[in-house]
């Protein structure tokens, strides 16, 4: 028979340590956060053998009073909070009072500290799970914590450690994450007595950008858009990569809530949704973002590692993030290297839109608002995408701008233009409908019938008039005027297929945009389709004023620039 018994302190501490101390990087994170909370301006980290042998953290912070040294190594002892209500306003990185106790339970730990204006420092050690009496020790202002032989007394945990090189990479990533949210703090990292990282204090914008560049890379910063967006008590700052810069893995995604690095599914999904219209399948956006919110509206006491948060109103935060990032992404236009100025939080990327007819797929381009000026060398610079020269095999448009040659994918560009116009028309007046001379009868399978019955209102809003015609048939009487009747049956089946596979819990707006993307893809010009110079010119001008005109609805690029210098190098000119 199993009897309930009380665990001794040593066993309880080692079990608790398993929640906080997963690997050497966990130790580094907890100790650096303590240094930051102590207002350290410089933090040095020394690592031996990936942290399994030694982790040494030294800072120049406030230091610890000698009388508090013993308490510092005990569980549930903290200077950050005094009562449960204090959790509503926590602004420090640490507050649980568990880190030092958990670390000392699975290592040989020595803590030395001296406060400002104190005559000397004091040292305390945890030997054989016994906290020794503090003794005087020479030490500069600040605190040094020496952690040796991590998991020496828990062999099961120690054998799960990876190689020293792997463990060190985890430590490096922890320091980089902390360095990205505490720019005024200097960070030094040494491994096996070799300096690996030295982030100097960054008090200027250029200094902060240099630190970001050293961590996320030059290519990220070259494609980065600065964002600063405030609304309804929320503020989002930082940098997001242009839609053309994506990653095969979500490895360059840094999000901070009130200065704390978090991994939050709600935030990650919101940011991905903001990129939805421009993200190629299987690719991931890159960003470093800082969300500021009233501490009373977010709970950071969700998990011992404090990587997870819980918002009081998650939908409010989600909508804000999507709107903020979409607005920033909308600032760039084809051929423009830097974001356009953002005037207000309600910035509308499409302004002064002339109510000209929309493009009709596989028909004449109805883009031309006026006869374009004949091409001359003197006006090339006026248009980022230049002026049309010719068309290649009914697929690509060749254009010349002041930089050199531009090649445009006709279908991809037309698809994006149609998609953005559809969204705008739907939001303003709804999609215009047109009657079919001969209604189309469609036989559907059970899944398709269910999808249509569930989404009748959606089809009506998209400009379709469809009626039931028996248990497994429908009849299409009217369709959006944007679309040609040709292949209308295939289009409706594709839309139904999208709705069948689409998450039924998704919000209506997202579902509508997904269907509009399918409509635009079907309506866009398809190769081979030959255009006149005037039609090509009209397409280029529309691209320049279309939101996300540099990418199609699936995230593929719509155009490519070839600079004269690049061509000269290829043809060995001047060599």
UniProtKB/Swiss-Prot annotation:
Q: Which family does it belong to?
A: Belongs to the DNA mismatch repair MutL/HexB family.
* Top-rank lineage group of the source organism: Bacteria
Q: Which UniProt keywords apply?
A: DNA damage, DNA repair
Which protein is depicted? DNA mismatch repair protein MutL
Taxonomic lineage is:
Bacteria, Pseudomonadati, Pseudomonadota, Gammaproteobacteria, Legionellales
Q: Which GO terms describe its biological process?
A: mismatch repair
A GO cellular component annotation here is: mismatch repair complex
Keyword Lipoprotein in annotation: no
Q: Which InterPro entries match?
A: DNA_mismatch_repair_CS, DNA_mismatch_repair_MutL, DNA_mismatch_S5_2-like, HATPase_C_sf, MutL/Mlh/PMS, MutL/Mlh/Pms-like, MutL_C, MutL_C_dimsub
Q: What exactly does this protein do?
A: This protein is involved in the repair of mismatches in DNA. It is required for dam-dependent methyl-directed DNA mismatch repair. May act as a 'molecular matchmaker', a protein that promotes the formation of a stable complex between two or more DNA-binding proteins in an ATP-dependent manner without itself being part of a final effector complex.
Record Pfam families: DNA_mis_repair, HATPase_c_3, MutL_C
Q: CDD domains given for it?
A: HATPase_MutL-MLH-PMS-like, MutL_Trans_MutL
Q: Name one GO molecular function term.
A: mismatched DNA binding
Q: Entry's PROSITE patterns? A: DNA_MISMATCH_REPAIR_1
């Amino acid at each position: 028979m199993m009897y309930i018994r009380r665990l001794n302190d040593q066993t309880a501490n080692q079990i608790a340590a398993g929640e906080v101390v997963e690997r050497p990087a966990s130790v580094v994170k907890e100790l650096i956060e303590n240094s930051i909370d102590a207002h350290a301006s410089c933090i040095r980290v020394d690592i031996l053998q990936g942290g399994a042998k030694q982790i040494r953290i030294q800072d120049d912070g406030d230091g610890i009073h000698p009388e508090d040294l013993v308490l510092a190594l005990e569980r549930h002892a903290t200077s950050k909070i005094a009562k449960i209500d204090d959790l509503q306003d926590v602004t420090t990185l640490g507050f649980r009072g568990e880190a030092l106790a958990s670390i000392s339970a699975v290592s040989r730990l020595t803590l030395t500290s001296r406060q400002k204006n104190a005559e000397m420092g004091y040292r305390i050690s945890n030997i054989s799970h016994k906290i020794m009496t503090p003794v005087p020790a020479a030490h500069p202002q600040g605190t040094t914590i020496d952690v040796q032989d991590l998991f020496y007394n828990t062999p099961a945990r120690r054998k799960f450690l990876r190689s020293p090189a792997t463990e060190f990479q985890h430590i490096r990533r922890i320091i980089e994450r902390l360095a990205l949210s505490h720019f005024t703090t200097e960070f030094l990292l040494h491994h096996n007595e070799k300096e690996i990282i030295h982030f100097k204090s960054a008090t200027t914008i250029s200094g902060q950008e240099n630190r970001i560049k050293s961590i996320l890379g030059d290519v990220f910063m070259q494609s980065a858009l600065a964002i600063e967006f405030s609304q309804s008590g929320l503020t989002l700052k930082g940098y997001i990569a242009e839609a053309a810069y994506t990653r095969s893995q979500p490895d360059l995604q840094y999000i901070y809530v009130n200065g704390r690095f978090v991994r939050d599914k709600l935030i990650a999904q919101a940011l991905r949704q903001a990129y939805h219209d421009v993200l190629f399948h299987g690719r991931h956006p890159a960003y470093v973002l800082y969300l500021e919110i009233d501490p009373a509206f977010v709970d950071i006491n969700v998990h011992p590692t404090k990587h997870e948060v819980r918002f009081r109103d998650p939908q409010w935060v989600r909508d804000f993030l999507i709107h903020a990032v979409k607005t920033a992404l909308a600032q760039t236009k084809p051929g423009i290297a830097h974001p356009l100025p953002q005037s207000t939080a309600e910035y509308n990327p499409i302004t002064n839109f002339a109510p000209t007819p929309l493009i009709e797929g596989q028909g004449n381009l109805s883009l031309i608002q006026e006869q374009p000026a004949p091409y001359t060398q003197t006006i090339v610079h006026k248009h980022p995408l230049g002026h049309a020269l010719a068309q290649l095999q009914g697929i690509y448009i060749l254009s010349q701008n002041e930089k050199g040659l531009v090649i445009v994918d006709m279908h991809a560009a037309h698809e994006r233009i149609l998609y953005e116009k559809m969204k705008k028309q739907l939001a303003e007046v709804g999609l215009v409908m047109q009657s079919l001379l001969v209604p189309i009868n469609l036989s559907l399978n059970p899944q398709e019938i269910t999808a249509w019955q569930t989404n009748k209102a959606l089809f009506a809003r998209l400009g379709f008039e469809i009626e039931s015609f028996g248990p497994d048939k429908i009849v299409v009487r009217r369709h959006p005027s944007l679309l040609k009747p040709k292949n209308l049956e295939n289009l409706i089946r594709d839309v139904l297929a999208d709705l069948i596979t689409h998450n039924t819990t998704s919000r209506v707006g997202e579902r509508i945009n997904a269907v509009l993307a399918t409509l635009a893809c079907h309506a866009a010009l398809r190769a081979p389709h030959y255009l006149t110079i005037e039609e090509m010119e009209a397409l280029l001008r529309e691209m320049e004023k279309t939101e996300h005109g540099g990418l199609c609805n699936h995230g593929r690029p719509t155009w490519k620039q070839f600079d004269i210098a690049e061509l000269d190098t290829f043809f060995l000119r001047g060599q």
